[in-house]
Amino acid sequence: MRRLLATTMMLLMTTAALAGCAGSDVTQDDVDAAYDNGYAAGTADAASVSTLDTIIARGALKCGVKDSQFGMGYLNADGTYSGLDIEYCKAVAAAIGIDSIEYILATGSNRFELLASAEIDVLIRTTTWTTSRDAGLNADFAGMNFYDGQGMLVNLDQFTEATSALDLDGANICVGIGTTTEGNLLDYYELHNMQMTTINTENAAAAQENFLDGSCGVWTGDMSAMVARMWGLRDEGMNLAIMPELLSKEPLGAATRDNDDDWNDVVAWVWYGMITAEEFGIDGSNYGDFVNSENPGINRLLNSNLGLGTDANPLSDTWMQAVLGAVGNYYDAYDRSFCDGDGEMANCLINRAGTLNALVSEGGIQYAPPMR
C-alpha cells in the first residue's frame, strides 16, 4: 500500500510541477513530506528502471494469476498450473530467457494493488480492459488473450422456469468484489426494471459455497468462468443452466504498470507473435523447419529482435523460437487449456471455432499487427 501511495504522490507532484503558476492542491510541504518518508525518491528510482531489467537481475518472473478457473488459471492437484493465462505467462518468460516463474495469486480485489506495488511483474488473470482501469489505475494493458462476455449460471431448482436472464427478477446473485461484473449486473437490472440482491464474494471458493448452500440462486461472471464452474459442479447433483444472454463485452488480457513501455511492448508482442505463428502455420512441433525460410515475414518472426527489450537486456533474435519451443502458437496454447491437448481441438470445454477467439481468417477477431 505504501508503494501505491508513493506512486500516487509522485504523479501528483509531477502534475504540480507541470502546472506551474496554474496552481495545485499539492504543496511544498506535501513534497517535503514525501521525500522525508522516502516515497518520492523510491518511486523516482523505480520509474527509471524497466521491469524487464529487474526481472533479468532477479532471475524469475512474477506473474499474477488465478488458481481456481479451469481453462484460464487453475492450480492442479499435483501443484502445477494450467490454463490460457498460464500459457501466456510461460510464453513471456521464454521470450526473455527466464526459466523460473513465480505464480502469485491475484484476487479480484487486490490484483491492481499487487501490480502497482511491484509485488507482481505482470497481471495475467482474466482481467477486463476498461477505460477506468487503463486511465485511473496506472495499468497499461497488453495482448488480449481471450474475448469473453458476462454470463449467468442459474440453479434451476430455485428458478424452475428460467430460460433467460430476464426470468431472474428478485434473484440473489453471487458476484465477485472488485470486478467489472458488479457494474454490468447493476446496469442490466436497472435497464430492465428488475430487482435483485447481490451477494458479494471475495473469491470463487466463497461464491461456490454460497451457490451450493442456496444463499444465491444465480452466479455471474465471465462466461468462460461460468462454463468452467458448471463443469466443476457436474457431480453435485444440481440442476444447472447458463442463460443465453451475454451482459457485456469482456476483453481479457495482460496488464503492466504505466510508463514501463519497454516491458509492456514485450508482453504485448509475445502474444502477437503466437497469433502470427499460427497464421503462418508455424507451431511448437514444426518451427525448426521454418528457421531458414525465405519468406521475409517468417524470417522476421523467427530470427529478429524487432527492437524489443531494453538497452541493457534486448531480446535475442530467436526469442520467438524460444516461445514456440515453450508453449507453441496460439492454437497450441488454447488446445491445451480448453481441449484435450492432442492438437485437434477436440472435446473442448469452450470451443474456439465460430467464436470471437478464432483467428480473423476463421471468422473471429484474434489478429496481430504486422511484425516488422
Predicted regions span which residues?
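Secretory targeting signatures
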Residues: 1-45
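Hydrophobic residues within well-ordered alpha-helices
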Residues: 92, 115-116, 168, 207-212, ...
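Bacterial Sec-exported substrate-binding components of ABC uptake systems
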Residues: 38, 42-58
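Extracytoplasmic small-molecule ligand-binding "clamshell" domains
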Residues: 49, 56-125, 330, 359
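Extended ligand-binding regions for polar small-molecule ligands
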Residues: 94-95, 156-159, 172, 179, ...
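C-terminal functional modules
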Residues: 308-372
